[in-house]
Structures are given as C-alpha cells and as structure tokens.
Amino acid sequence: MKRVLLLVCAAALGSTSLSYGFDQEEKETIRRNFPATVRLEVDDVHGFVHVTGYSGTEIQMVAEKTIRAESQERLDAAKREVKLDTTQSGDTLTFYVDGPFRCHCDDGRFGVHEHSHPGYRVIYDFELKVPTGMSAELSTVNGGKIELRGTTGDFDLSNVNSSIEVEEVSGAGKVQTVNGGVKVVFAGNPRKNCTFKTVNGGIEASFRPNLSADVHLKTFNGSAYTDFDATALPVTASAERRDGKFIYRSNRSSAFRIGNPR
C-alpha cells in the first residue's frame, strides 16, 4: 500500500495561447540504439519526452519528428535550421534539439527564446527505453508531457505548459513545471532529498508506508493534505529590519515530520 502526500497549488496566473496557420506538414521517424551509459539527458523544445526503464543493456530511442510550416519555403528552412544533436561525453548520452530559438547565452545557458514566429514549428516526440539504473535529466517547453517510469537512478525533470508524471521509481531528484501538474509514485522511498514544484497545477506524491522524512511545504492560493501520521515542525520566519522594527514573514510555508528521519 502506498501513502499519499497531496499539495494543491492553485495559483491563478494568466497564460497565452497562440495558433498559426500551417499549410505544410512533413513527418519522419528516427530510430537509434546506443550502448548503456550512466546518465541520459534529453533537452527538447516542442514535444513530449517519455522514458521507461527495462532490463536490457541498450538505450533505445524513437523520435517522431513533425515539421509544420506556413509554406514549402518555410518547411525547407526548418529542415536546415532545426537539428537533433546527439552526443556522448564520458558517462552521459545527450539528445539536444537545436535551432534559432536557442539562446546560446554568454553565461553558458542554452535557454529557449522565440522572439518572433519563424513560420514553422518542429516537434520532436521522444520515446526511450533505458537500462533501469540510469539517471535522467529531461526537459521540454511546449506541447508535451514528461513521463519517467520504472527507473532506479536519480532524476531532474523540467517542463513548461504541460504536466510531469513519474511512476514506480526509486531514485531521488527534482521535478518542476509551470502550467501543469506533478504526479510522482515511488516504488521504493527516496534515500536523498527531493523537490517537487509547480505553478498553476497540483502535486501528488505517493510513497511507501515506511517513509521517514521532514516535509517542507509552500503554497500560494492552495492547500495540502497527507494520509501519513505526521507531526508539525516549527517554521522559521524570515526577518527584515524596517523603520527600526523587525518584520517577520512566514511566506505561507509549513513543515511536518513523518516517521523518524535521521
């Protein structure tokens, strides 16, 4: 039996949806197998990323590439400008969708900055099977859910404009999204710290009954509940000095203890 910690973050923030008229479409299926590594990185922009652990020794990748464009000229431009880069460095295999929308910032970040519409959209939908023990860093921005299932390695998952679902894992890590929900189900309780965040969504985390952990919560316009037996912990308020007085703020946070964490 699993126990559930549910945190509902119901912040009412506005979102904008833009649609464009695409008259041209072209599809391609990319299939590749790779030797197992310790770590997998998938950095997508448009599309979903689904990763499943299995008992094999290879990384099996299937990517469905879809180009939608306003004209044949823009479709040809998309073929030239947007590429799937695959690199293996040390113990890490990386799939990276590159194009004019990438920042290539001076501080080394590779963010997404679409300041103007290029007249096309290139979607990569990833399905991967990986050896169970691999760790995973997965991210996407538009139009796709991130799913991670059946792995024992650690994880770092990031999404925008969709949800993240993690099932039957026993690693630890970070899960965060905007405009989407977070659902995490552990097959074995994590042995290291975990962080789950969302804006405009809910968080549902399910653990094994023998969980021992200190849980820290922070929500804006939301509520939380758990079916674990829990003991409230004191929350340290932040303080600032203003006009000769100390002002204390709790930042809508709370904390409680489950079991007997060391």
What spans do the regions from the language model cover?
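Intrinsically disordered, low-complexity terminal regions
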Residues: 1-262
